[in-house]
Amino acid sequence: MERQFEIVSAYSPQGDQPVAIEKLVEGINSGKKKQVLLGATGTGKTFTISNVIKEVQKPTLVMAHNKTLAGQLYSELKDFFPNNAVEYFVSYYDYYQPEAYVPQTDTFIEKDAQINDEIDKLRHSATSALFERDDVIIVASVSCIYGLGSPEEYRELVVSLRVGMEKDRNQLLRELVDVQYGRNDIDFKRGTFRVRGDVVEIFPASLDEHCIRIEFFGDEIDRIREVNALTGEVLAERDHVAIFPASHFVTREEKMKVAIENIEKELEERLKELNDNGKLLEAQRIEQRTRYDLEMMREMGFCSGIENYSRHLTLRPAGATPYTLLDYFPKDFLIVMDESHVSVPQVRAMYNGDQARKQVLVDHGFRLPSALDNRPLTFDEFEEKTNQVIYVSATPGPYELEQSPEVIEQIIRPTGLLDPPIDIRPIEGQIDDLLGEIQDRIAKNERVLITTLTKKMSEDLTDYLKDVGIKVNYLHSEVKTLERIEIIRDLRLGKFDVLVGINLLREGLDIPEVSLVAILDADKEGFLRSERSLIQTIGRAARNENGRVIMYADRITRSMGIAIEETKRRRSIQEAYNEEHGITPKTIQKGVRDVIRATTAAEEPETYEATPAKKMTKKEREKTIAKMEAEMKEAAKALDFERAAELRDLLLELKAEG
């Protein structure tokens, strides 16, 4: 029986949500490939998207630009769809140091990773759900465009078991080993099985506490039961069960033999090429590493870093598009790109960064050239694989607007809250003026966000406010994701009243208690003060009925002008709607709860060693400057302004010393 998406919620669509839902559904049903939902902060974009999914009844991939945001969306969607399969698919690394080689110092960095077992389980749960049912929503980070094993292989290697089926017990054990399950009669955990006489217990890779107990009578399956793995309590009787592979990179034996032959052939060609070019060390290195991997694959059907051979294992030609999570979806599916102004540039950037690192490994004999095909999708490949897309953002980027010129707006908040009024005040005396405003807010038990241009200014301002007795905290780039969540929680609970930072646009900063957002040096045109950044920052004051924004500036820049006009336009639409429907704006009442503890991938941004510029050659300095400028622009594009500002300050120092 086909399951339908159904929303369980005490709310019904309000404000301009019904119109947005109707237009989006109409667009999808009429076959529109791309649509843009411009949803102002706090207008209930997730609820709108949930209603669209319910209306169109299509499996949906919701893409977020980081794990924390994906975690928040997963929690919200799980609340709206308790009877459907809402799954979570993000990188399963708690810590990830990719394999790399630094030729200048002849340093090889082994891949070092710590896999989060819980997230690995959720990833398996996500892929198996796509093969078992249609009512699936998968919330994913951009790791969903990285290579996965072939969905056909994954589907074909499912071990299907039914009551009454003729099956030799030992044959079942062999099949389980073929799909990467290990026999373990003592430490019974996910991805293992154990045998007790005529009873085989299997712990599927996608389950947490339940295992499947298969009871044989001779060569026939007599009974299938779902059992609590810890207590042995029988939870359910089953007529049929499908055991999905314990790894996404699984290959049938005959395919594995062909793959091993092809890898050996490639190795011989590569050795000849390296020896002909006099690269003897590289030749010895690649031969030693590859032969070891081949031996492991012959004996175990698996090796460490097997994903680097994925092109051979799936028998794809060189340069072919890799399989990703998108291939596990049926043809007719929907993609929702949340915060698309960040997600789209992020998808674009993935491929180039990955190739640059791998090319060095190939050149120096650490990997065969085919490893370059274990990669994320290019942007064009991603576009080809998408069916229908909804881009969701308060400030859609140029790409989204170009793809879908007709923007669907959602500006009215169900709470009646308005976009905040904006004051422009002179820079001279800004700190004293700001101090007075802060004290007014503290007296009313409200909170303040202050955004500055440089790290130094943030630190100085924080110190000054502390000295005059204000409870203040400073949010900077070194603060890890989970600490950020703690800081935001403490701000909401009133442990401090003011939060200072460079980049206040990251996730989780929509705080109802904030009634003032102060933007210092608002007239310094640049990536920190672009129209998109300003509109996003202004939105931080839109969850409180007393919300207000103060821009400290001596002139109105083009970006300021656009942001102010757009805010006024939205505010007038909201006021007219409130007047017509007799709505009085009310601050959002939102309980303070712990956000889902999503883990962070420890692929830290590059750090630049403090080599004095005087000791650098002219060429080295130019190279470092070019590299830092490129990284600064990338960081700015991704709205990671703290990192971009840090790099800008380093660049200024470097240029000055040069």
UniProtKB/Swiss-Prot annotation:
Record domain Helicase ATP-binding: where: 26-413
GO MF:
ATP binding; ATP hydrolysis activity; DNA binding; excinuclease ABC activity
Motif stretch (Beta-hairpin): 92-115
Q: Where does ATP bind?
A: 39-46
Q: Where in the cell is it found?
A: Cytoplasm
Domain named Helicase C-terminal: residues? 430-596
**One GO CC annotation:** cytoplasm
Question: Where in this chain does the record put each UVR domain?
Answer: 622-657
Q: Which UniProt keywords apply?
A: ATP-binding, Cytoplasm, DNA damage, DNA excision, DNA repair, Excision nuclease, Nucleotide-binding, SOS response
The protein's matches in InterPro entries, at most eight in alphabetical order, are given as: Helicase/UvrB_N, Helicase_ATP-bd, Helicase_C-like, P-loop_NTPase, UVR_dom, UVR_dom_sf, UvrB, UvrB_inter
**Coiled coil stretches, renumbered:** none
GO biological process per UniProt: nucleotide-excision repair; SOS response
A family per Pfam: ResIII
Say what the protein does.
Answer: The UvrABC repair system catalyzes the recognition and processing of DNA lesions. A damage recognition complex composed of 2 UvrA and 2 UvrB subunits scans DNA for abnormalities. Upon binding of the UvrA(2)B(2) complex to a putative damaged site, the DNA wraps around one UvrB monomer. DNA wrap is dependent on ATP binding by UvrB and probably causes local melting of the DNA helix, facilitating insertion of UvrB beta-hairpin between the DNA strands. Then UvrB probes one DNA strand for the presence of a lesion.
Record remark on domains:
The beta-hairpin motif is involved in DNA binding.
Quaternary state and partners of this protein?
Forms a heterotetramer with UvrA during the search for lesions. Interacts with UvrC in an incision complex.
Q: Which family does it belong to?
A: Belongs to the UvrB family.
Query: What is the protein name given in its UniProt record?
Result: UvrABC system protein B
Q: Which organism is it from?
A: Bacillus anthracis
